[in-house]
Each structure stands twice: as C-alpha cells, then as structure tokens.
Amino acid sequence: MSEAMMWLMARGVWETLMMTFVSGFFGFVLGLPVGVLLYVTRPGQIIANNKIYRTLSGVVNIFRSIPFIILLVWMIPFTRMIVGTSIGLQAAIVPLTVGAAPFIARMVENALLEIPSGLVEAARAMGATPMQIIKKVLLPEALPGLVNAATITLITLVGYSAMGGAVGAGGLGQIGYQYGYIGYNATVMNTVLVLLVILVYLIQLSGDRIVKAVTHK
C-alpha cells in the first residue's frame, strides 16, 4: 500500500470518528429528552399522559423503521438546506443524527424501565417534583444503562457512516467503496474492514469500562 493511500486511510479513520461521535452527541441531545418523556408519560408513571406517549412513540417507531440508506437519500433536500451541501462530512452528520435520535430515545426509555418502581414511589412519597425525580433518581440510577445505550449507538453509527460513504459522505466507507469496490482493490477493502472492526472493538471496550466504573456497588 502506497504512502498516499496510508494517509488517505488515516483521514478516513478521522472522518469516520468525527461522523460517529458528533452525530452521536447530537443524537443524544435530541434522543435523551424524548426517551425521558416517553418514560414519564407512560401509563402509571409520574406524569402519565397517554396521548403524548402514543404520539411520541408513534413518531419514534416511524423513524426507527426507515432503513438508514433510504433515510440518507430522503433527507438530501433537508441536509442541503441545513449545511448547504448533500455530500461530505458535514452533510453526513445531519441524517446520522436523525437516524440515531429515535434509536437512542427508545433505549433511554428501556434503561429507565429497568429502575425499580419502588425508588420512584419513595421519591414521590417524600414530595419530590417530577423534575426532581428525573434529575435525582431516574438519570443517576439509569446511568449504567445510558452508557451502554451510548456504546451501542456509537457502534451502530460506525456502520451507518460506512453506508453513508457509498454516497459521498467520506470516511472509511467511501474509501472502501471507491477504491476497494469500484477500483477492485482487495487490499484496500480488507484494510478498511480491519480498521472498522478495530474502531468497533475500541468503542465497546471503552463503553464496558465506563459502565463498570459507574455501576453502583
């Protein structure tokens, strides 16, 4: 492999990491409050509202059901309106964020559902407000589950970013498609594959260690 290709690979790794972590961050900015709202508005919860819950749940399910490659193409006009282009690193972050947010919201809801109901009831009995329960009970108790959700999301986004590379998003996916598939270069394709596996492994390893650190003894 030439030196130029090695530099291209290094740039691809950087672009993949940027797409993954930036879209993961914005995905959590959108998905975390939606997930919390899904939990607290469920029947029997602290601010139960069946209409809000069904509406939010329906929207989340709709976006979760759309395959990412279709979402990527469908969002081209919106992406172009937001960042001024439909190709490249910045353009990829928009559909990646939209694709990640409903996935995160549902995992946040599931993490909160694992909290023993007795903790919430005890907080309510002591006169805690819904916001206090969310900040002082729900989020701290669900932290290991939320970290695990973040880990799964980032790994999923690595795969999404690789798919986005096939339509000009950049990163390792574009290198693998352009030079490996179109250019019939097995060495490039195998190198991209190995790098993606390493990225996923490192993300999972880091996530497991953080979960262990924040888990209540």
Swiss-Prot record:
| Positions of transmembrane segments | 20-40, 58-78, 81-101, 152-172, 186-206
Alphabetized Pfam families for the sequence = BPD_transp_1
InterPro entries, per database record: AA_ABC_Transporter_Permease, MetI-like, MetI-like_sf
Membrane protein topology class: Multi-pass membrane protein
CDD domains, alphabetically? TM_PBP2 (cd06261)
Q: What are the entry keywords?
A: Amino-acid transport, Cell inner membrane, Cell membrane, Membrane, Transmembrane, Transmembrane helix, Transport
The ABC transmembrane type-1 domain extends over 13-204
Q: Matching SUPFAM superfamilies, A to Z?
A: MetI-like (SSF161098)
Family statement drawn from the similarity comment of this UniProt entry = Belongs to the binding-protein-dependent transport system permease family. CysTW subfamily.
Could you tell me what this protein does? Part of the binding-protein-dependent transport system for D-methionine and the toxic methionine analog alpha-methyl-methionine. Probably responsible for the translocation of the substrate across the membrane.
Q: What is this protein called?
A: D-methionine transport system permease protein MetI
Source gene?
Answer: metI
